[in-house]
Amino acid sequence: MPEYRSKTSTYGRNMAGARALWRATGMKDDDFQKPIIAIANSFTQFVPGHVHLKDLGQLVAREIERLGGVAKEFNTIAVDDGIAMGHDGMLYSLPSREIIADSVEYMANAHCADALVCISNCDKITPGMLMASLRLNIPTVFVSGGPMEAGKTTLADHKLDLVDAMVLAADPHASDEEVATVERSACPTCGSCSGMFTANSMNCLTEALGLSLPGNGTVVATHSDRKQLFLNAGRTVIELCHRWYGAEDATALPRGIATFAAFENAITLDIAMGGSTNTILHLLAAAQEAQVSFTMQDIDRLSRNVPQLCKVAPNTQKYHIEDVHRAGGIFGILAELARGNLLHTDVATVHSKTLGEAIATWDIIGTQDEAVHTFYKAGSAGIPTQVAFSQSTRWPSLDTDRTEGCIRDMEHAFSKEGGLAVLYGNIAQDGCVVKTAGVDASIHVFEGSALVYESQEAAVKGILSDEVQPGMIVVIRYEGPKGGPGMQEMLYPTSYLKSKGLGKQCALFTDGRFSGGTSGLSIGHASPEAAAGGAIGLIRDGDRIRIDIPQRAINVLISEEELASRRLEQHAIGWKPAQSRTRKVSSALKAYSLLATSADKGAVRNKTLL
């Protein structure tokens, strides 16, 4: 049987010094025979999705210790993409994913931890910890801080979120008082932003991957039911330790759970729920850490066959994550996919022998278990707070309407093709991605003239000064992982296009990426990126570009000869922005840029350069 990794620092006379230090942390004689379980917390007062996590690591620790383990907590960094957005701070967001992954690896390996509990929540923290867990391949459970409650105001008859505040702020017809009212109401509680944005998308995907417990992605941060998820995470990691160290059960390890089939399940869910395009970036990166050959081609293949069964903000104003929970949560969607034979139900999870068994237990349509029904009735209280587990509101009934409800069955899908698509063409030879769930059907085929910007800042200035007119395709380049560096999110440009009434009359194409809050004909992750010699760097003002989502195509309408001529010309002067940028790029960001791959590889480090 495998020995505890921690034995390296706890066993033998020569480890007396290490044990002396362990004792200084509070360990006793009998603790040296127990598994040492690392708790990777991500508490910070900078991020609403993490502001309530301070004491939750110790909640898990006490449960681990009660059940015979030794718990040791540490913290990672966490960047708030919304606060970092619109200025040079966004350059640091995606690179922080690698820092988080490395920091978890460093702590777990430096101290020979036997297992891991990841307390994550927001945009790059869950992906970074996911990458680390698959890299380490020790028993691991994920538990998130949970989603924020949606906001409410008398100015609108629908719920609010962060994007509403951003769009209204750029609307010249809105008064300062209206903007202030929405600003104060859009983000009322702690938790990750309330729509199907990147953070919530990733926390939902950990359920499909099998690495977190049911409800992880959908129980709001303020609800008392989430406390039980944290306690159960402590119990589950102890069980996983017994299964691996006591019985050498490989399905207790992240790589034994997150197999190729599990990654197919995750992207199938992603497509069905119209998740953030960032999830593609992060799943590709995680798959590489899992040593799974999961690529853009696999995503393209699945996107053609999976319908959209759930539509949530920003793709609609009707539903937020709290409504998904009321409709049965992620297992409600997984159950419908399973009924359509679109899932691998024989894969393992941290909490059930197979995903199929878990679906049978947690599907509100298929089970009569009152405890399960009660669990999915957990709702929001509408009381502004930064305190976790502070309310116990329950919906009077579940949303079991699979015809017109938040979650649909296969027959009544929101669309027959899913919410994410991969496009290819002469300006995205290795692919680019679009969240079709947020694109109006009238512009699934769109042709327009290019208006090229060499930075997000220039594009924002151009949009706000009315340079962008109906029928144009805004091209923002040199914003990829290497060229930015850091692959900035383009939520401000897309929000401002909406504010100008151009959401259905223009498109945006970039080698950067988009916030999970983005909707509209916004196509990102163009690969190769401009800084790596990608053809997006060859587009000129006035070029006609044709986007054809049904055919999964995007092309600039010029001859191959002209494209080749431009390539030679660009190669001679170097792949860099035509206009100089005032952007301050630190040595840390330069180091990231030197190793960064394009988005089709997950923007991970190019290991061939190491």
UniProtKB/Swiss-Prot annotation:
Pfam family, one: ILVD_EDD_N
UniProt protein name: Dihydroxy-acid dehydratase
One Gene Ontology molecular-function label: magnesium ion binding
Modified residues (N6-carboxylysine): K124
SUPFAM superfamilies cross-referenced by the UniProt entry: IlvD/EDD N-terminal domain-like, LeuD/IlvD-like
EC number, as in UniProt: 4.2.1.9
Chain ranges passing through the membrane: none
Organism for this UniProt entry: Xylella fastidiosa (strain M12)
SUBUNIT field: Homodimer.
Designated gene of the protein: ilvD
Entry cofactors: [2Fe-2S] cluster; Mg(2+)
Pathway linked to the protein: Amino-acid biosynthesis; L-isoleucine biosynthesis; L-isoleucine from 2-oxobutanoate: step 3/4; Amino-acid biosynthesis; L-valine biosynthesis; L-valine from pyruvate: step 3/4
Binding of [2Fe-2S] cluster, residues: C122, C193
Function statement: Functions in the biosynthesis of branched-chain amino acids. Catalyzes the dehydration of (2R,3R)-2,3-dihydroxy-3-methylpentanoate (2,3-dihydroxy-3-methylvalerate) into 2-oxo-3-methylpentanoate (2-oxo-3-methylvalerate) and of (2R)-2,3-dihydroxy-3-methylbutanoate (2,3-dihydroxyisovalerate) into 2-oxo-3-methylbutanoate (2-oxoisovalerate), the penultimate precursor to L-isoleucine and L-valine, respectively.
Taxonomic path: Bacteria, Pseudomonadati, Pseudomonadota, Gammaproteobacteria, Lysobacterales
PROSITE patterns in UniProt: ILVD_EDD_1, ILVD_EDD_2
